[in-house]
């Protein structure tokens, strides 16, 4: 099958989730692991069937795995994507729109795709506190997301100034991702965190 690598990654994520969830450093009940999907994968019914089958077999609780839709190329079949997102959510996956604000992503996509999480691209975070349009765009996304009961992840937070500005938004639905908190790490490094605290 064309998407065997991604399906293997989903299996691996399911196994890793079960192990990492037991670590002492993971105290949040909202803990989940994300992986990226391409537009081609989200538009492929056979791939969606297999992904749902893997999650069902795993017996994991709902929302323990998040599929991030990476929109690097234009959407070919919006109706099929909307339908497949609905199927994935009903099966228990979280859905995120990754790198929002780049390439083809736009407000129309936000309205039509029933994502749980909007991940705002690092390009917007880089301009925080310096560029009016970037600040106002993020504030707008936060307001809309709050009304729609969606979470927002601001990507690429790399310093205290950016972090302080984001904290100043005083929004309960905003989360951050970036080197200011941690670089990406493997399972063994996550495991080591439980002994360092």
Regions found by a protein language model. Give the residues of each.
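Catalytic core of bacterial c-di-GMP phosphodiesterases, primarily the EAL and HD-GYP domains
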Residues: 2-80, 156
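EAL-family c-di-GMP phosphodiesterase catalytic domain
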Residues: 22-23, 38-43, 64-76, 93-197
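Charged helix-capping and loop-helix junction motifs
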Residues: 49-53, 80-83, 132-139
């Amino acid at each position: 099958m064309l998407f065997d690598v991604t399906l293997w990654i989903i299996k691996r994520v399911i196994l890793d989730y079960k192990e990492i969830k037991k670590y002492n450093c993971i105290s949040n009940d909202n803990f989940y692991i994300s992986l990226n999907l391409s537009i081609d994968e989200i538009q492929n019914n056979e791939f969606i069937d297999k992904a749902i089958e893997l999650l069902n077999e795993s017996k994991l609780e709902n929302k323990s795995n998040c599929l991030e839709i990476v929109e690097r190329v234009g959407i070919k079949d919006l109706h099929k994507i909307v339908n497949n997102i609905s199927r994935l959510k009903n099966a228990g996956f979280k859905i995120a729109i990754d790198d929002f604000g780049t390439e083809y992503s736009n407000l129309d996509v936000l309205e039509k795709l029933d994502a749980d999480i909007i991940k705002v691209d690092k390009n917007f975070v880089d301009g925080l506190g310096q560029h009016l349009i970037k600040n106002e765009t993020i504030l707008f996304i936060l307001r809309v997301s709050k009304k729609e009961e969606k979470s927002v992840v601001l990507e690429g937070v790399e310093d205290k100034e950016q972090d302080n500005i984001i904290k100043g938004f005083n929004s309960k639905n905003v989360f951050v991702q970036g080197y200011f908190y941690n670089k990406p790490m493997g399972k063994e490094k996550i495991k080591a965190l439980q002994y360092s605290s």
